[in-house]
């Protein structure tokens, strides 16, 4: 819908308003997502436009532009509405609005994209409003130059907020909110509306705010005395080009690295802004706790970055913009893959092995232990990973999987392998055949739990235990007994990637070297200790002692395959090369590599291919093998105290008999039975890295959902019921502890299946 209104001459100017997207809109219906559209009104001029409607999303993307004629006293109101509800009653379907006064319009135009917070129509409105809208204002008397290709992937990370509260401990923002009366274009006060007003400060105020935020840049900022007069813009830094998209949107390209950004490099980046769309910037930004000196791309020398990784190629578009082709995964990107080494270096600086500076003042309670800092940094890196993966998830469609419990392995294999990787990234919806459960996360968790129990079972021959008394999984070198074993390993890799992508966990523990191989890191002798202690002890003895009069080995080792003793040469003609004091280090190194890669090269590459189809390899660079193990498998140890302290009670209190008896029963359970209880209620035996306070509930929920004990009014002959999507267990008011224990045990051990109430 569009109403251009009347074109006014004289003092009015033509402005192109681009409405790019909205983010984190309020979800007001539990079972339905809104159909958002944006409405743009130039107050007092009769100009009115509406964007297209985007179906079923809280993060709509429009990328539509409108040419507006704005006078000196005009203001622009942008409101977001739910198309499903606008016809029900007056004001229904309102999701938030923002109003730009004339002063703000003049300040914001030609500054690229800005993210504005949505607010209520009236302060007295009870409906929740949250989220942001990303827009840009551009005068139409400019002529754009350069190419028309632009990388839009980094737009949602551009935290160019127009206003920001400056609470205690927070830096000042370059733009500040200033209360103003609600006036129409004539200046008369108007009633009924209370949209957020945006009033830009003067240049002097912005300079002062920048000085307060970062004293180190005082000398680099222009003062009002030496500032250029008029609207003449300073020159761009060396290596930058200003270009314009087909829709008239201005962006900036760093020609040496091929990185594009909506942020003007001539303007100091406000606190909270992530310059550009490079993932390395995002990692550095979040890991440093939102402290923000913008990264100078001029300091990046392409020669110092070295050659491209294997399988990568540099190409350029018709307009001359450089992009990079990954032939390994058949993908393209504008970001130089060599910049991820910089990101990895920044993350390595956070390792706890480095000494931590002590605070100059404050109590001992304020000091941070290395373990605490390490955990905090790991949580931050995990948040960044989740954010990067969420950007890759399609907004529409579902990844629907329907299997039977009896044939869960084969049916899952057939359905997963016929899907494309981009289909697996859609919202996961799992259904067990013959059951009516709706999957809001709990059914998918149970599906993964049951599938892993089958898929990783050594009975199928894909995996084996590392030793007879250490039950850690490794790839079975004799898996080729199954002619389709490589396809099954590809499937296993996809399942692991699917779990990580959708925030679930794999119920199975692999060896530490397996995770190092997934990260592409070399395996060392120390990695052997947790897998094969006896062999590790023997190889360490060889290194630490003189073997000349003791050992009579060659560079040839024996191994058992299907009852036959086979020999393997660690190097060419190894059977004729004796192990001596001079070459024993080479022998140990080759032996360790052979021990972990013996006959599993093809299997591992197939598994890694499936995993990287959903989790790109460069996103794993900041993590080590222990962290990757936590990302894939979560915590397998259940902390009962953490469980108790992060449990929500519904229709009961901590002193209720039901609650006391429940925890009394849990305390009598062994580790295995506690894990079964947790799986019964949440769908998974694994706990998130942050503990029980981070238990995930329904898919798409804004935050975690705590474990919940719900006392219900039901017949005490009934068994407890679990709602895995909400991490809730419903318990009838049993008369005694013995009855609760019996019913709880029966429900956990003897029942399965989903239904809809």
Curated annotation (Swiss-Prot):
Localization, UniProt: Cytoplasm; Cell membrane
- Provide the membrane topology annotation: Peripheral membrane protein
Q: Which residues carry this modification: Phosphoserine?
A: 200
What is the reaction catalyzed? S-ubiquitinyl-[E2 ubiquitin-conjugating enzyme]-L-cysteine + [acceptor protein]-L-lysine = [E2 ubiquitin-conjugating enzyme]-L-cysteine + N(6)-ubiquitinyl-[acceptor protein]-L-lysine
- Region feature (Disordered): 193-237
Q: In which tissues is it expressed?
A: Expressed in melanocytes.
Please report the stretch or stretches of sequence annotated as the C2 domain. 1-120
- In terms of superkingdom, the source organism counts as Eukaryota
* Modification after translation: Auto-ubiquitinated in presence of NDFIP1. Ubiquitinated by the SCF(FBXL15) complex at Lys-381 and Lys-383, leading to its degradation by the proteasome. Lys-383 is the primary ubiquitination site.
Protein known as: E3 ubiquitin-protein ligase SMURF1
**Which residues are responsible for catalysis?**
725
Q: What is the protein's quaternary organization? A: Interacts with TRAF4. Interacts (via HECT domain) with FBXL15 (via LRR repeats). Interacts with SMAD7 and TGFBR1; SMAD7 recruits SMURF1 to TGFBR1 and regulates TGF-beta receptor degradation. Interacts with MAVS; the interaction is mediated by NDFIP1.
Q: Name one GO molecular function term.
A: transforming growth factor beta receptor binding
């Amino acid at each position: 819908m569009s109403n251009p209104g009347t074109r006014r001459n004289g003092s009015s100017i033509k402005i192109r308003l681009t409405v790019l997207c909205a983010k984190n809109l309020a979800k007001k219906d539990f079972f339905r997502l809104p159909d958002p559209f944006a409405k743009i009104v130039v107050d007092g001029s009769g100009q009115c436009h509406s964007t297209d409607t985007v179906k079923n999303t809280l993060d709509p993307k429009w990328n539509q532009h409108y040419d507006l004629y704005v006078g000196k006293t005009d203001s622009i109101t942008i409101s977001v509405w739910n198309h499903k509800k606008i016809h029900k009653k007056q004001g229904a379907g309102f999701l938030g609005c923002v109003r730009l006064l004339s002063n703000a319009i003049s300040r914001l135009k030609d500054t690229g994209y800005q993210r504005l917070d949505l607010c209520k129509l009236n302060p007295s409105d009870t409906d929740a409003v949250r989220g942001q809208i990303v827009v840009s204002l551009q005068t139409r008397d400019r002529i754009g130059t350069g190419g028309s290709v632009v990388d839009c992937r980094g737009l949602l990370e551009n935290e160019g907020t127009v206003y920001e509260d400056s609470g205690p401990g927070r830096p000042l923002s370059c733009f500040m909110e200033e209360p103003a009366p609600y006036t129409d274009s004539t200046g008369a006060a108007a009633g009924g509306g209370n949209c957020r007003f945006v009033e830009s400060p003067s240049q002097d105020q912005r300079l002062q705010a920048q000085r307060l935020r970062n004293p180190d840049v005082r000398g680099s900022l222009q003062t009002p005395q030496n500032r250029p007069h008029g609207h003449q813009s300073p020159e761009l830094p060396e290596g930058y080009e200003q270009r314009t998209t087909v829709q008239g949107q201005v962006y900036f390209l760093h020609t040496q690295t091929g990185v594009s950004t909506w942020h003007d490099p001539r303007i100091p980046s406000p606190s909270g802004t992530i310059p550009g769309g490079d993932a390395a910037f995002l990692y550095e930004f979040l890991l440093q706790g939102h402290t923000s000196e913008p990264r100078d791309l001029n300091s990046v020398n392409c020669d110092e970055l070295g050659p491209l990784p294997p399988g990568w190629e540099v190409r350029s578009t018709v307009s001359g913009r450089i992009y990079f082709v990954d032939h390994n995964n058949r993908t393209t990107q504008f970001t130089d893959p060599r910049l991820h080494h910089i990101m990895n270096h920044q993350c390595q600086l956070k390792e706890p092995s480095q000494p931590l500076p002590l605070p100059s003042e404050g109590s001992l309670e304020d000091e941070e232990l290395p373990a605490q800092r390490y955990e905090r940094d790991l949580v931050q890196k995990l948040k960044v990973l989740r954010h990067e993966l969420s950007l890759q998830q399609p907004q529409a469609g579902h990844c629907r999987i329907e299997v039977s419990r009896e044939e869960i392995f084969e049916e899952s294999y057939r359905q997963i392998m016929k899907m494309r990787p981009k289909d697996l990234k859609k919202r996961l919806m799992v259904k067990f055949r013959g059951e009516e459960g709706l999957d809001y996360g709990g059914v998918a968790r149970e599906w993964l739990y049951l599938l892993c129990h089958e898929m990783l079972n050594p009975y199928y021959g894909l995996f084996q235990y590392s030793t007879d008394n250490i039950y850690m999984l490794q790839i079975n070198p004799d898996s080729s007994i199954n002619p389709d074993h490589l396809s099954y390993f590809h499937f296993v890799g996809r399942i692991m990637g699917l779990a990580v992508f959708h925030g679930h966990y794999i119920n199975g523990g692999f060896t530490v070297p397996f995770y190092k191989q997934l990260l592409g890191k070399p395996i060392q002798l120390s990695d052997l200790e947790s897998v094969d202690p006896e062999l590790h002890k023997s190889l360490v003895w060889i290194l630490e002692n003189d073997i000349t009069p003791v050992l009579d080995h060659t560079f040839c080792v024996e191994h058992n395959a299907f009852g036959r003793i086979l020999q393997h040469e660690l190097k060419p003609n190894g059977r004729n090369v004796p192990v001596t004091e001079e070459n024993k280090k080479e022998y140990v190194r080759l032996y360790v590599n052979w021990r972990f890669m013996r006959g599993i090269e093809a299997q591992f590459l197939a598994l890694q291919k499936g995993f990287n189809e959903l989790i790109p390899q460069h996103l794993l660079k900041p993590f080590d093998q222990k962290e990757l193990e936590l990302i894939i498998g979560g915590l397998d140890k259940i902390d009962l105290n953490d469980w108790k302290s992060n449990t929500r009670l519904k229709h009961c209190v901590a002193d209720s008999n039901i609650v006391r008896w429940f925890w009394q029963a849990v305390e009598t359970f062994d580790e295995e039975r506690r894990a079964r209880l947790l799986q019964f209620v949440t769908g998974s035996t694994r706990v998130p890295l942050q503990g029980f306070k981070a238990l995930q509930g329904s898919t798409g929920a804004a935050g975690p959902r705590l474990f919940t004990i719900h006392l219900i009014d039901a017949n005490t002959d009934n068994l407890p019921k679990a709602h895995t999507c909400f991490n809730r267990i419903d318990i009838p008011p049993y008369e005694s502890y013995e009855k609760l224990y019996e019913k709880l045990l029966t429900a956990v051990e003897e029942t399965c299946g989903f239904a809809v109430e």
